[in-house]
Curated annotation (Swiss-Prot):
Residues 507-529 are annotated as: Disordered. It holds the Pfam family Late_protein_L1. GO terms for biological process: endocytosis involved in viral entry into host cell; virion attachment to host cell. It comes from the Viruses. InterPro entries: Capsid_L1_Papillomavir, Capsid_L1_sf_Papillomavir, dsDNA_vir_gr_I_capsid. The lineage of its organism: Viruses, Monodnaviria, Shotokuvirae, Cossaviricota, Papovaviricetes. Keywords: Capsid protein, Disulfide bond, Host nucleus, Host-virus interaction, Late protein, T=7 icosahedral capsid protein, Viral attachment to host cell, Viral penetration into host cytoplasm, Virion, Virus endocytosis by host, Virus entry into host cell. Self-assembles into homopentamers. The capsid has an icosahedral symmetry and consists of 72 capsomers, with each capsomer being a pentamer of L1. Interacts with the minor capsid protein L2; this interaction is necessary for viral genome encapsidation. Interacts with protein E2; this interaction enhances E2-dependent replication and transcription activation. HAMAP family: PPV_L1. It is found in: Virion; Host nucleus. Belongs to the papillomaviridae L1 protein family. This is Major capsid protein L1. GO terms for molecular function: structural molecule activity. It comes from Human papillomavirus 52. One of its GO terms (cellular component) is host cell nucleus.
Amino acid sequence: MVQILFYILVIFYYVAGVNVFHIFLQMSVWRPSEATVYLPPVPVSKVVSTDEYVSRTSIYYYAGSSRLLTVGHPYFSIKNTSSGNGKKVLVPKVSGLQYRVFRIKLPDPNKFGFPDTSFYNPETQRLVWACTGLEIGRGQPLGVGISGHPLLNKFDDTETSNKYAGKPGIDNRECLSMDYKQTQLCILGCKPPIGEHWGKGTPCNNNSGNPGDCPPLQLINSVIQDGDMVDTGFGCMDFNTLQASKSDVPIDICSSVCKYPDYLQMASEPYGDSLFFFLRREQMFVRHFFNRAGTLGDPVPGDLYIQGSNSGNTATVQSSAFFPTPSGSMVTSESQLFNKPYWLQRAQGHNNGICWGNQLFVTVVDTTRSTNMTLCAEVKKESTYKNENFKEYLRHGEEFDLQFIFQLCKITLTADVMTYIHKMDATILEDWQFGLTPPPSASLEDTYRFVTSTAITCQKNTPPKGKEDPLKDYMFWEVDLKEKFSADLDQFPLGRKFLLQAGLQARPKLKRPASSAPRTSTKKKKVKR
């Protein structure tokens, strides 16, 4: 102890010129900073892959549709204009620039009559389908369909103009046609795909503004339905509400909504039901350059150019509302996404191909077969040609063939699995007929004698209300495959391709004839002569 005090005095002697006592004092009363303390996040339930609770079997089925055909007018639907039938559609709108959204209805595997049911226990397990193979067949030849507008708002050619145009007149619209952006698309999921487009938004403080003001824009998400228009090269937007002139784009989209698949939202969906996988190929270049006629709502600032002389055409600056005409360029069979099989081994989301609700959604876009057929009907027969003696019609036809390979899967219904599925979609357990069974009623019931008498209340039993379809307000091309399942995969083209790539062997159908035993040659005995 004496040595420790000695060393302390020696230290004080050498640091006598430095005041270190306040340092020791500060260290003795130091406290941590009173800044904000960040606590760890509250644990939340995780979304797991379907492979965690779905067991796959070695049972596969093939299912295919019939030849699916549709024919209509490529630009607009034709309605009956007679009195009383103004809303009846005589010829629908069928364009190569439309989405085809097929809603595939599958049979309930829990009601299947399997020859051997020993592979699962119906008391503790349920069966579901998993899509493992898909082939979308497209008929009809390759072709480019064009569209246009008989009164398109096109003022001047801004690409190869040899003179400066003057002021636009009252009406400078022209008849112009063009081809569109080239798109091939396939989306597979058990829920409808989600699209996005720009629509008219709501201004702040209910300020509607003055007539002619630019409307606010809002990105809108909506379900892609069968018949919705794709992005043709003019953007994904609501042309009906954002273009009042109805002359800025071709007639097939001037009053429509062009949607683009919202890949970002579907990819970030927690359960991954809308997008198992997708195939996409887009191609476009610009063919011509024009500008619009009309008053510019946002004029070019004066500091960006030097004013022209009053004596020439440059005294008035032309419209800077430039726009191009898109083009999808050449279509070839070498760049086709269709008429070939695709095998689903691992989906990009948590749903690895499980068809919840016994349904599947296949979304198809193919603008490489968008040929518009011209039909001509004779009104009056004469020896000389006259235009008035013939009527011209436009029609577009499409042909599809859908083939699938489904794998039978089973789910063991533990308490954790049922809780997870109920949180994901409560209707799944309802379809599996899980619920509390009410006890037998012990109350006294009333029974009337004359059930048809008008003196008593109606005795007809109210029919039970059927299950309401949550997608009844949407338009899909429904394809029923409930009676088109087959276990004989080798009898169908896609089934044979699946057996080949999976290394499986089809069950023999015919018994081979028993091979006959080889004849034993009898040696001749030598006879002495």
